[in-house]
Swiss-Prot record:
<dbReference type="InterPro" id="IPR020573">
    <property type="entry name" value="UDP_GlcNAc_AcTrfase_non-rep"/>
</dbReference>
<comment type="subunit">
    <text>Homotrimer.</text>
</comment>
<dbReference type="GO" id="GO:0009245">
    <property type="term" value="P:lipid A biosynthetic process"/>
</dbReference>
<protein>
    <recommendedName>
        <fullName>UDP-3-O-acylglucosamine N-acyltransferase</fullName>
        <ecNumber>2.3.1.191</ecNumber>
    </recommendedName>
</protein>
<dbReference type="GO" id="GO:0016410">
    <property type="term" value="F:N-acyltransferase activity"/>
</dbReference>
<comment type="similarity">
    <text>Belongs to the transferase hexapeptide repeat family. LpxD subfamily.</text>
</comment>
<keyword id="KW-0677">Repeat</keyword>
<keyword id="KW-0443">Lipid metabolism</keyword>
<comment type="pathway">
    <text>Bacterial outer membrane biogenesis; LPS lipid A biosynthesis.</text>
</comment>
<keyword id="KW-0808">Transferase</keyword>
<dbReference type="GO" id="GO:0016020">
    <property type="term" value="C:membrane"/>
</dbReference>
<comment type="function">
    <text>Catalyzes the N-acylation of UDP-3-O-acylglucosamine using 3-hydroxyacyl-ACP as the acyl donor. Is involved in the biosynthesis of lipid A, a phosphorylated glycolipid that anchors the lipopolysaccharide to the outer membrane of the cell.</text>
</comment>
<keyword id="KW-0444">Lipid biosynthesis</keyword>
<dbReference type="InterPro" id="IPR001451">
    <property type="entry name" value="Hexapep"/>
</dbReference>
<dbReference type="Pfam" id="PF04613">
    <property type="entry name" value="LpxD"/>
</dbReference>
<dbReference type="Pfam" id="PF00132">
    <property type="entry name" value="Hexapep"/>
</dbReference>
<feature type="active site" description="Proton acceptor">
    <location>
        <position position="239"/>
    </location>
</feature>
Length: 345
């Protein structure tokens, strides 16, 4: 059944104030370009402000003092957050629990909470614990002794290795591997001796992990992902790493073993982090950067190797001019030699 709300109701839901017709009914969310009269849109980036005047939306979510150009509007402190909440209200329908469906394989001594759904083709090993409202999609493999909290969703082809622990309200997207062996080998003459990886992975509450990401199990204790952290697709987190709370790790990041991230650290796309390092709280690392050493709390760094972001911007501005500068330096060197030859004559 479609959801519809008046602007007055939406303003109460979002903690905002209405400008215009409070009784206007809204039944969906769309972009500034595509919205129709029954839909609400939002403005979070000032560069798109001119589109407020031309949008076909029935209402616009704006920041405080934002120009509404005669449109119905809801003013809120954080339009982007409001947009997310509106999408949840209008377009995210809760799934009805299906129980253990035919074709699912469930082992012995599995403890299940209420309203669990296990789709056909999923495998749940012996001694697994599933909290309330867990959803396990086709192709998921859960090894023995795993613990999942409540409101956990594992999308198709996720694999969770033995003994790993996943908290409440965690979503893991398709193809991700939790708890595979860490990359540990001891040199043995001309070859290598595999170091058994006996630890686990612990994923705390409110974490989301994207598709095709790998988080390796620790050698002895736990690789840990802190509460509220968001991890994108195609990320590699090696054994023994500890990721702090509310971190953001963007696609194609690689974090080597035993590295620790503090709280609220952001690693942009394709960052590479060496092993046995510490990155302090509230630090930000620019895309494609290489981290060879520790990063103090509150830092903003970029580059290979990474250094202060502002200095990196200045250095990057010089790079396109290097051929011209090289030519200029060569000419200056030639003139200096000529002057020296004249003085010595």
């Amino acid at each position: 059944m479609a959801v519809s709300r008046t602007l007055r109701e939406l303003a109460e839901y979002l903690g905002g104030t209405v400008a215009g017709d409070e009784s206007k009914t809204i039944s969906g969310v769309a972009s500034l370009d595509d919205a129709a009269d029954h839909q609400i849109t939002f403005l979070a980036n000032p560069r798109y402000a001119p589109k407020v005047a031309t949008t076909g939306a029935g209402a616009v979510v704006l920041p405080p003092g934002g120009e509404r150009h005669g449109r119905n509007a809801i003013h809120v402190a954080n339009p982007y957050l409001a947009f997310a909440k509106l999408l949840t209200l209008f377009h995210v329908a809760p799934r009805k629990p299906q129980g253990v469906m035919e074709g699912a394989l469930v082992g012995h001594n599995v403890a299940m909470g209420s309203d669990v759904t296990i789709y056909p083709g999923a495998f749940v090993g012996d001694g697994v614990t599933l909290g309330d409202r867990v959803t396990i999609f086709p192709g998921v493999v859960i090894y023995e002794g795993v613990t999942l909290g409540s409101d956990v969703t594992l999308h198709s082809n996720v694999v969770v290795y033995q003994g790993c622990r996943i908290g409440n309200r965690v979503t893991i997207h398709a193809g991700t591997i939790i708890g595979s062996d860490g990359f540990g080998y001891a040199p043995d003459g001309d070859g290598f001796y595999k170091i058994p990886q006996l630890g686990i992975v612990v994923i705390e509450d409110d974490v989301e992990v994207g598709a095709n990401t790998t988080i390796d199990r620790a050698a002895l204790a736990a690789t840990r992902i802190g509460r509220g952290t968001k991890i994108d697709n195609l990320v590699m987190i090696a054994h023994n790493c500890v990721i702090g709370e509310n971190c953001t790790i963007v696609s194609q990041v690689g974090i080597s073993g035993s590295t620790k991230l503090g709280r609220r650290v952001t690693l942009a796309g394709q960052v590479g982090v060496a092993g046995h390092l510490e990155i302090g709280d509230n630090s930000m690392v620019g895309a494609k950067s290489g981290i060879p050493g520790n990063i103090p709390a509150g830092s903003m760094v970029s580059g290979i190797p990474a250094f202060n972001h502002r200095d990196w911007l200045r250095a990057s501005a010089v790079v396109p001019k290097l051929p011209e500068l090289r030519k200029t330096i060569a000419e200056l060197e030639k003139r200096v030699r000529e002057l020296e030859e004249k003085q010595g004559a």
